[in-house]
Each structure stands twice: as C-alpha cells, then as structure tokens.
Amino acid sequence: MADEIMENVELTTSEDVNAVSSFEEMNLKEDLLRGIYAYGYETPSAVQSRAIIQICKGRDVIAQAQSGTGKTATFSIGILQSIDLSVRDTQALILSPTRELAVQIQNVVLALGDHMNVQCHACIGGTSVGNDIKKLDYGQHVVSGTPGRVTDMIRRRNLRTRNVKMLILDEADELLNQGFKEQIYDIYRYLPPGTQVVVVSATLPQDVLEMTNKFTTNPVRILVKRDELTLEGLKQYFIAVEKEEWKFDTLCDLYDTLTITQAVIFCNSRRKVDWLTEKMREANFTVTSMHGEMPQKERDAIMQDFRQGNSRVLICTDIWARGIDVQQVSLVINYDLPANRENYIHRIGRSGRFGRKGVAINFVTNEDVRILRDIEQYYSTVIDEMPMNIGDMV
C-alpha cells in the first residue's frame, strides 16, 4: 500500500536525503518497531521513508506531504526514537492548530509507544487546568498541545522546558498564520538553544516557508511538488447547483449515498453548520455536527461517536479539515467551497486516508465557478461533473 504511494509521489527534496525502504533499516528501538507494526504499518510511505531518519539524526526538517500519508507517525516515530525514557521530563513538544488534532497526535504517540511506557499528555484549551498541572507535575516525555494552553503552562512553570530537545509544528501553515504566530514565537523563546525543529504540513506556501527560517538551522527539506498535491486515488467531482437555495435539496438527494460508509460535509461558517444540521433533522435525516464554538466535552463525544461509526454523517467547519483521521470516511462534500484554496486539500484529504479510495463532491453555484477554476489551476487538477452512478464509487 505505502509502496504505491512511494512510486507515485515525486519529492523535491534536499540533495542528501535517501529513501529507506523498510522500518527495519532505520535502526529503530526494538520496542518502537513492535509498536509500528502493531499500529498496522508495514512499509514506510514516501514522507516516512525520507524524513524519519533525518529526524532521528537530530536535523531540523521541513516536510510537506499529502494528507493521509502518515505525517503524524513520521514525527511521532522520530520523537520516540530520540527521547530518553529514563528522564521523566518533557523532551518533545508538539504544537497543533486544533484541540482535536492535538488529542489525535497524543493517541498516535501512545499507540506507537505502547511497548515503551512513554508518557504523553495533550495540553489543550477547554479542559481542566488542574488536570494539566497534575499530569505535567507527574512528568511527561511528550506534550502535544495547542499554542494558547501550552504558553499558559510554560508561564506557570508547570511545563518545564529545560529538557526539551524537539519542537514539532504540525499543520505549520495554520500555526504560522496570524492567529498563532506570536504565541509560537513566545514558546520558541522559552526553549533551550539548539532545540531541534520539525515543521510539517500538507501545504507550505512561500511566506510560511520563509518564516520557518526564524526557527530552523540548515533544515533538510522534504517537499512534494504542488501539482503532486491533489491526492492520489481521490476522485473529485462538482455538482452545478446554480443557486445557494438549491444546495439543500441536492444534499437530501445524495443522503443515501452518504451513509454507505461515512461522510463529512463542510460549511464555511458555524451558523451555516447549525442551520444545515437543523434543516436535515427537520427533514428526518440523521446527522451530527461539530464546530469550534461547542464546548470541548461535546466535541470529544461527537468525535468519539463518529470514530466508532455510531454516526455516519458529520457536518462541520474547517476545524475538522486539519489532520483528523477517521479511516472509514470515503466521501467528503464541500457544501460551501473553502474560502481559502489551501484548505481544499485539507478537506478532501479526509477521505481515502493512506491510499484508500475516496470521493470529494463540490457544490458549485454560478458564483462559485471562478473559485473552482482557481482550485483546479492551483493544484493542476481537473474536477469533473459528477456522474450518475456515484454510489458505486464510494
């Protein structure tokens, strides 16, 4: 599976980076290898085969690769190989733009490190500060968190940074956007000089790449060409709906197709998510929804339900577009086309994870045609009109 990905993806990469074709060749700790195989990996994906070794060597790394190609496992394996488990102090700090992603990364680190007795805590807003303090005082090898809460814990001196040797910026394009930029700089200033920095994202626009110069020293770059970025094995379609008002009926017509496996429907605003959820329920369709204004507990419960397959159709904002991995999702619908073309790949990458087949359907009004063309041009891709037999493809 991962071999196919390796063959099909061409990387624009620093000169001295060789691909390693198996996890055994990486000289990883025995207990870590056990965790990797137990997690279901057999051979490394394109980004894993190149980046893991460089991270283990202690090099600063900038890695850009498609959604669903195992980027989280790439830096998690690098961390687990590099930390000293006999020192129960924070040695690796992972920053993510959303709480859900921070928790998911924590789960990946714990799963891969299952045989290593690794301590990893998710330090995120919307949860108990007291619990964070207790966990951090106990000692955590790895902290996965959102910038606001991590900054708070460092300032309170509960998150001690003296032994931190690795900083990971996941979904770096979002993290280095205006919203988080200052917090990231603040956190970086608290870290020991010479901290290794790993920057990871599916999209790394030029301005973000330039900004990474502030954090990195002579980084190894592992970059996928932009025209390689639309996802292998993902079918992309559009439905011409002419007017905004016609989208709802179109979605109702598609509902039976949505529930064949699991589907995610993206809207551009929280209000739209609430409105569409209510309309669908009034029409007797079963849906769940999630956005950033919901309390963390509620968001966790909804995610849990969706992961377990108890709910099959999730309506949400872009909060869900960032790296959330639910294996059964094979259909993504852009009820609204994303306002930011970089988010397109994050959204459609929710289907067809790690090389499974997936389908993305874009609802396009007359006003949206220009945005669709822009997305096609940006990713050098062609988005066709949806065929009648869409149910056979999901």
From Swiss-Prot:
Xref: SMART domains: DEXDc (SM00487), HELICc (SM00490)
Ranges where the Helicase C-terminal domain occurs: 233-394
Short motif (DEAD box): ranges: 170-173
Subcellular location: Nucleus, Nucleolus
PTM annotation (Phosphoserine): residues: 67
One Pfam family here: Helicase_C
Domain Helicase ATP-binding: 52-222
Catalysed reactions listed for this entry: ATP + H2O = ADP + phosphate + H(+)
One annotated GO molecular function: ATP binding
Annotated positions binding ATP: 65-72
Principal subcellular localization: nucleus
Source organism, top-level taxon: Eukaryota
One of the protein's GO biological processes: mRNA splicing, via spliceosome
Keywords associated with the record: ATP-binding, Helicase, Hydrolase, Nucleotide-binding, Nucleus, Phosphoprotein, Ribosome biogenesis, RNA-binding, rRNA processing
EC number: 3.6.4.13
GO cellular component: catalytic step 2 spliceosome; chromatin; cytosol; exon-exon junction complex; nucleolar chromatin; nucleolus; nucleus
Short motif Q motif, span: 21-49
Family listed: Belongs to the DEAD box helicase family. DDX48/FAL1 subfamily.
PANTHER family named in the record: ATP-DEPENDENT RNA HELICASE DBP3
Free-text comment about domains: The Q motif is unique to and characteristic of the DEAD box family of RNA helicases and controls ATP binding and hydrolysis.
Physiological role: ATP-dependent RNA helicase involved in 40S ribosomal subunit biogenesis. Required for the processing and cleavage of 35S pre-rRNA at sites A0, A1, and A2, leading to mature 18S rRNA.
Name of the featured protein: ATP-dependent RNA helicase fal1
Classification of source organism: Eukaryota, Fungi, Dikarya, Ascomycota, Taphrinomycotina
Gene that this polypeptide is encoded by: tif412
